[in-house]
Amino acid sequence: MKTPIELKILDSRIGSEFPLPAYATPGSAGMDLRAMIDTTLTIAPGETVLIPTGIAIHVADQGLAAVILPRSGLGHKHGIVLGNLVGLIDSDYQGPLMVSCWNRSDSPFALEIGDRLAQLVFVPVVQAQFKLVDEFDSSDRGEGGFGHSGTK
């Protein structure tokens, strides 16, 4: 299923030097976002920086949202993860997409112009309406949490 999402190019290198975000394979869930920086950026150990992607989107459909997620290789191999862990893009947001990058490793990391640094995934949204109750109906789990089911 393909849903049209409005995209605005904010950096002219997108679509010329670097491709528009796209799915790498038919089974891909996310589209790569690139670091649209002007020069190589070294992220020091423990440092967090905000990186422009060169695009803005408008999801518009209130039944959808977008999430910005880390790329697994950057986190596992280099310790580069998202500073906010997950970026949530509401359907009515129309501003630039930025990626908060946190270097949780002990080594500096050089981010190059156009590097793929995160992925954009669209997800369905359900807006809940709370129903106040005095007690919950019982369940097998009850209030058990934080490892209550064990590790094996």
Swiss-Prot record:
What are the binding positions for substrate in this chain?
A: 71-73, 84, 88-90, 98
Q: In which pathway does it act?
A: Pyrimidine metabolism; dUMP biosynthesis; dUMP from dCTP (dUTP route): step 2/2
Which controlled-vocabulary keywords does the entry list?
Hydrolase, Magnesium, Metal-binding, Nucleotide metabolism
Q: Which InterPro entries match?
A: dUTPase, dUTPase-like, dUTPase-like_sf, dUTPase_trimeric
Keyword Thylakoid tagged: no
Q: Which NCBIfam families match?
A: dut (TIGR00576), PRK00601.1 (NF001862)
- Per the record, the gene is dut
Catalysed transformations (reactions):
dUTP + H2O = dUMP + diphosphate + H(+)
- Which cysteines form disulfides? none
User: A single GO BP annotation from the record?
Assistant: dUMP biosynthetic process
User: Per its UniProt entry, what is the enzyme's top EC class, as one word?
Assistant: hydrolase
Q: What is this protein called?
A: Deoxyuridine 5'-triphosphate nucleotidohydrolase
Its Enzyme Commission number(s) read 3.6.1.23
Entry keyword annotation includes Metal-binding:
yes
* Cofactor(s) in the UniProt record: Mg(2+)
List the HAMAP family.
dUTPase_bact
| Pfam families per record | dUTPase
